[in-house]
């Protein structure tokens, strides 16, 4: 991906003069003119994270070979140009145009935050040719160096801004950058229920966080949807409710990608809806569904958690040192249960940026009177040194036995398994079967979730917990100085005293990272822990090795 | 005490500034307190401060008797080491200076031996202008006498030394400026220089080495980084940054930086984005160049927790370190160990870049004693005071990384396997100084 960037300056240097003549025919000759978009689209596609600095150079690079091939075709193959070839060319053009449109649309969607880019590029799909041809000509012509020099200002600001926005997706994870997460309820369909609207925002802000919690909250919201649902005339409830629900689901997934547990729950709910006899009266059907939801939550989560906590607590012995990562609700329940049972043990919580979920766990455990030690990811090797057991929560268990959990879990499990010169520490995963999935994952890259990278910008730990839902404030540097002070008092706000100016720089180096070329921030949500690091998975159906996940999953879905 | 005397914030630069004016004992106290309070923290700053202080100590020590010089340096060294036992660089520099003095003393003895046979004696040259002109003569007399006495008692021992042990280090390190050039100069200039001048020159060379070490290491960058590589690193180590920058001048690759959250993330963020905000002592004395991103290198900043997730795509892990132990193990910023471990699991080579001055002759027996714990409020800020009361918050600053997790060391002398480090140790430090 970097090669063209390398070659661009040299190519442009050579081709500046020769590129001039072919540029004139380009405007009158349709094929060559259409060649341009092809190249353009291709370069744009190849280099998702292309810097806008190099953009003019690339634009210049592109027409040169295009013109070359075009002139070659004109010289050698113009006369024997068959209709078939013409057709092929036309098809290619069309494909290219389509690709370009798609890219522009994606770009517009991705850059929803920046209205300028949308305005600048909204029209091209309608008239791609007109838009590109002059641009291409301008880049080829004597204006090109000018553009390059003033690459930061320039007339093509809109284009550049769009490029910059695209820039920020890490290439390896390109497939994971979907549309940007929804920031408001604006634009949500009118059929989306108010409870779902609220839940969506809560999910997005990590107010409802954790696989089980998200699952329960979703089911409860859907229960309210079902309760307030009335079948429109001319359809039956089993047919229409599914589509009605799918609107809600789509909305939820724009707020935050659905978790495995949510997916499993929704699948079960849809099955339940499909099972309803169309002749059942509406109120009876709704009652059945509500009961189904209640029993699903009870069986799959609430009772399951109790069962797991009880059996996991039995694994804890007096004098144990339990290491856990981040804040899993089921691990919390387990530890509290063990404490309740009168076991004497110590807990070491490892936490990570940016969510600091372990803090809440630490608070809960400390309030319950447990002996808690707290450190961050950098202290893993110290925390694991005197550990006797590792308890982990799960986001999901994949069919190949991998544990898919909050990013950093794999590091903890690995450290437990590879303690230098010591006995291996058993790694125990607590996981409800509703989190089992038939998907497989070899690494953490193919399946993952990417959170807003702005969450990484603020370095202040306290803000992370309380002020998370306001990424807009972090992107705008001028607001920053007030931000950390906001919680304290109004007295410090008017005077930018030395203390504040000293504290402010900490978030500032990254504050403008979106405008910094070549700099990317990556905020992954999950990672996949290899199955060999997991000794035991405790589920409500019993304690299993990770290899038993697909079997249990099949059993539980066939029921 | 140091901060009251100076308007500057205490640190390396203020220390060096005050070194010229303050009396020796004050300077020693000054450095001791700086070390104790961790106002000097980076290994190179510590090394530089120690070297400059020893330069002052040696130049103020009005004796040319090597034993007295050694005693003086040892006593100062002991105080510095006691001030911050985990800062091994200080001990390393002291040991190297001691080694210098011993080398010079031995050479001198040999020279005396040879000269007395030849019967020729020339005026001692003092290239460095020392305050008094009368000194050289006295010193020479003293040296003569003491050496004479020495010679009568143990000439065979000296010659045995020179027969067996001495020639080896000379041959085996042709490229260390610190240890090679004094000998070379000695042979070319004749054997008449006094010990102290030679030692001072040697210390100056150590200081020069400290200044150049990053660039020397960076010179090997192109041997290790190829195009389109994905490199993972940790913290904002200047050595690593320079290494990568050197390669960035010629090649395009991708750098993933783990931010090393509580202890070094601010510096890492600043390094990554190129806007250096805090005037860190680390950055003040080397002209920091353009950041990597300005060279067209894609830099991806990740939280430390994402290391395992990304490791499968990483081609190489390049790490800086705090100090290197003689067994090839590392004492590096906390979090390094899991990164190295994750790299090992993914069969990714781990390269450690470190100046030779960080190489310590200490064999670690008690790993925990090497680890320093830092400010817990960085992990859990005081806003969570209720929580801080109830739980035990830990913020380790260093990690011990065992040698088997490291594939390659790149020092200013070149690349070495971890198992070879003991050899470099024996080249740089004399056995008698290892525990002084």
Task: Specify the residue positions occupied by each region the protein language model found.
Chain B
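Conserved phosphate- and dinucleotide-binding cores of soluble alpha/beta proteins
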Residues: 128, 133, 138-186, 242, ...
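Small/polar-residue-rich loop-to-helix segments that shape phosphate-bearing ligand pockets
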Residues: 182-200
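Glycine-rich phosphate-binding "P-loop"
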Residues: 194-213
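A short, well-structured juxtamembrane/interface segment
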Residues: 209-226
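Gly/Ser/Thr-rich loops at beta-strand to alpha-helix junctions
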Residues: 230-241
């Amino acid at each position: 991906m970097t090669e063209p960037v390398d070659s661009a300056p040299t190519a442009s240097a050579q081709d500046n003069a020769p590129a001039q003549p072919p540029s004139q025919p380009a405007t009158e000759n349709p094929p060559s003119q259409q060649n341009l978009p092809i190249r353009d689209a291709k370069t744009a596609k190849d280099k998702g994270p292309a810097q806008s600095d190099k953009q003019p150079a690339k634009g210049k690079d592109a027409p040169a070979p295009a013109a070359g091939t075009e002139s070659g075709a004109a010289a050698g193959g113009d006369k024997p140009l068959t209709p078939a070839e013409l057709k092929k060319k036309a098809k290619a053009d069309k494909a290219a145009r389509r690709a370009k449109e798609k890219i522009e649309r994606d770009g517009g969607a991705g850059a929803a935050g920046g209205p300028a880019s949308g305005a600048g590029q909204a029209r091209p799909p309608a008239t791609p040719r007109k838009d590109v041809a002059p641009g291409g000509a301008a880049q080829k012509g004597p204006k090109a160096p000018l553009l390059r020099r003033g690459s930061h200002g320039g007339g093509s600001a809109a284009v550049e801004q769009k490029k910059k926005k695209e820039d920020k997706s890490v290439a390896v994870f390109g497939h994971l950058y979907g549309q940007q997460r929804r920031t408001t309820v604006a634009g949500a369909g009118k059929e989306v229920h108010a409870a779902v609207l609220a839940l969506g925002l809560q999910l997005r802000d990590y107010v409802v966080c954790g696989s089980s919690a998200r699952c329960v909250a979703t089911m409860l919201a859907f229960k309210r949807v079902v309760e307030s649902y009335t079948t429109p005339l001319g359809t039956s409830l089993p047919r229409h409710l599914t589509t009605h629900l799918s609107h809600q689901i789509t909305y939820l997934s724009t707020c935050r990608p659905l978790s495995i547990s949510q997916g499993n729950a929704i699948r079960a709910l849809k099955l339940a809806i499909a099972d309803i006899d169309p002749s059942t009266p509406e109120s009876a059907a709704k009652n059945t569904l509500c009961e189904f939801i209640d029993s699903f939550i009870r069986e799959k989560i609430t009772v399951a958690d109790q069962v797991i906590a009880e059996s996991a607590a039995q694994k804890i012995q007096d004098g144990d040192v339990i290491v856990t990562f981040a804040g899993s609700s089921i691990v919390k329940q387990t530890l509290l249960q063990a404490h309740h049972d009168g076991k004497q043990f110590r807990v070491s919580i490892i936490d990570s940026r940016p969510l600091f979920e372990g803090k809440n766990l630490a608070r809960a455990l400390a309030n319950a009177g447990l002996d808690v030690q707290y450190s961050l990811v950098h202290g893993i090797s110290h925390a694991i040194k005197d550990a006797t057991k590792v308890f982990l929560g799960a986001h999901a268990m994949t069919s190949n036995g991998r544990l898919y959990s909050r990013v950093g879990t794999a590091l903890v499990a690995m450290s437990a398994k590879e303690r230098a010169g010591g006995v291996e520490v058993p790694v125990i995963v607590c996981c409800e079967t509703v989190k089992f999935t038939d998907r497989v994952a070899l690494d953490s890259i193919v399946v993952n979730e990417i959170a807003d990278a702005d969450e990484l910008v603020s370095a202040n730990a306290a803000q992370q917990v309380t002020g998370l839902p306001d990424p807009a404030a972090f992107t705008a540097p001028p607001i920053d100085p007030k931000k950390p002070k906001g919680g304290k008092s109004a007295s410090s706000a008017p005077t930018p005293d030395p203390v504040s100016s000293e504290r402010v720089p900490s978030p500032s180096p990254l504050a403008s990272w979106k405008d910094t070329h070549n700099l990317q921030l990556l905020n992954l949500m999950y990672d996949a822990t290899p199955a060999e690091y997991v000794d035991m998975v405790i589920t409500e159906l019993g304690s299993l090795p990770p290899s038993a996940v697909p079997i249990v999953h099949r059993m539980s879905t066939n029921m | 005490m140091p901060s009251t005397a100076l308007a500057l914030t205490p640190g390396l630069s203020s220390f060096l500034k005050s070194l010229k004016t303050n009396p020796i004992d004050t300077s020693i106290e000054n450095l001791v307190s700086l070390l104790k309070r961790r106002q000097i923290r980076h290994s190179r700053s510590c090394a530089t401060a120690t070297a400059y202080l020893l330069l002052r100590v040696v130049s103020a020590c009005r004796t040319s008797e090597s034993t007295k010089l050694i005693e003086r340096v040892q006593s100062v060294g002991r105080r510095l080491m006691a001030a911050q036992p985990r800062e091994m660089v200080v001990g390393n520099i002291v040991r190297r200076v001691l080694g210098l003095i011993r080398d010079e003393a031995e050479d001198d003895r040999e020279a005396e031996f040879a000269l007395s046979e030849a019967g020729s004696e020339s005026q001692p040259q003092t290239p460095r202008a020392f305050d008094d002109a009368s000194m050289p003569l006295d010193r020479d007399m003293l040296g003569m006498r003491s050496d004479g006495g020495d010679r009568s008692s143990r000439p065979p021992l000296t010659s045995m030394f020179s027969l067996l042990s001495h020639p080896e280090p000379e041959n085996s390190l042709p490229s260390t400026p610190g240890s090679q050039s004094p000998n070379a100069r000695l042979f070319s200039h004749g054997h008449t220089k006094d010990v102290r001048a030679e030692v001072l020159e040697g210390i100056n060379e150590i200081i020069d080495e400290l200044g150049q070490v990053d660039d020397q290491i960076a010179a090997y960058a192109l041997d290790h980084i190829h195009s389109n590589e994905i490199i993972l690193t940790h913290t904002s180590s200047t050595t690593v940054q320079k290494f990568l920058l050197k390669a960035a001048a010629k090649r395009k690759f991708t750098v993933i930086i783990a931010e090393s959250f509580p202890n070094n993330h601010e510096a890492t963020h600043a390094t990554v984005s190129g806007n250096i905000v805090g005037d860190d002592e680390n950055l003040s004395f080397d002209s920091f160049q353009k950041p990597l991103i300005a060279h067209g290198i894609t830099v991806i900043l990740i939280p430390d927790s994402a290391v395992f997730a990304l490791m499968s795509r990483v081609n190489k892990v390049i790490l800086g370190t705090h100090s290197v132990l003689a067994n090839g193990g590392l004492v590096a910023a906390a979090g390094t160990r899991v990164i190295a471990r994750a790299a090992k699991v993914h069969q990714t080579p781990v390269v450690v870049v470190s100046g030779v001055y960080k190489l310590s002759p200490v064999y670690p027996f008690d790993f925990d004693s090497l680890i320093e714990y830092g400010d817990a409020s960085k992990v859990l800020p005081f806003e969570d005071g209720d929580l801080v009361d109830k739980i035990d918050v830990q913020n380790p600053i260093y990690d011990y990384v065992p040698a088997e997790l490291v594939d390659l060391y790149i020092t200013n002398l070149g690349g070495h396997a971890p198992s070879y480090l003991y050899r470099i140790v024996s080249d740089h430090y004399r056995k008698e100084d290892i525990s002084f």
